[in-house]
Amino acid sequence: MRNLKKTRRIQILLVAGGALVLSTALIGYGMRDGINFFRAPSQIVAEPPAAGEVFRLGGLVEAGTLVRGQGEEITFKVTDGGASVPVTFTGVLPDLFGEGKGMVGTGEMVEGTFVAREILAKHDENYMPKEVTEALKEQGVYRDPAQPEG
């Protein structure tokens, strides 16, 4: 009788463990398209992403690179001070988007150019996304907007 209880307990634990592993795998599989990792331009140059991989690119819009094409097509470069990545975007840019301003875009690399599906700009003069701030600090080009220049 005692041996039967022990066997039953082991069976229940194995089934529960298997169910936990299966549910975790299914949740991870279901969320794989919703997870977009952040990358700075220096990281992309050092370690190019896989073909078709959707990720977020962030940095500063490089001065002198913003070109408006036909229709709603825009090209520019994003930099973190260490490297620059060319970007194309077709659509309406946020009002606060501009050269020298922080941005984060979601998209993928196509033949060396980041093709953005969505562009987000910082929402006021002092805010910068945490990932962009960290990438700029790593490159040594971050300037605190709260501190006066000079």
From Swiss-Prot:
Heme binds at H123, Y127. Pfam families: CcmE (PF03100). It is found in: Cell inner membrane. Residues 1-9 are cytoplasmic. The chain crosses the membrane at residues 10-30. It is a single-pass type II membrane protein. InterPro entries: CcmE, CcmE-like_sf, NA-bd_OB-fold. The keyword Membrane applies. One of its GO terms (molecular function) is metal ion binding. SUPFAM superfamilies: Heme chaperone CcmE. Its main location: membrane. Residues 31-150 are periplasmic. GO terms for cellular component: plasma membrane. Keywords: Cell inner membrane, Cell membrane, Cytochrome c-type biogenesis, Heme, Iron, Membrane, Metal-binding, Signal-anchor, Transmembrane, Transmembrane helix. Heme chaperone required for the biogenesis of c-type cytochromes. Transiently binds heme delivered by CcmC and transfers the heme to apo-cytochromes in a process facilitated by CcmF and CcmH. NCBIfam families: PRK13254.1-1, PRK13254.1-5. Belongs to the CcmE/CycJ family. This is Cytochrome c-type biogenesis protein CcmE. It comes from Rhodobacter capsulatus (strain ATCC BAA-309 / NBRC 16581 / SB1003). The lineage of its organism: Bacteria, Pseudomonadati, Pseudomonadota, Alphaproteobacteria, Rhodobacterales.
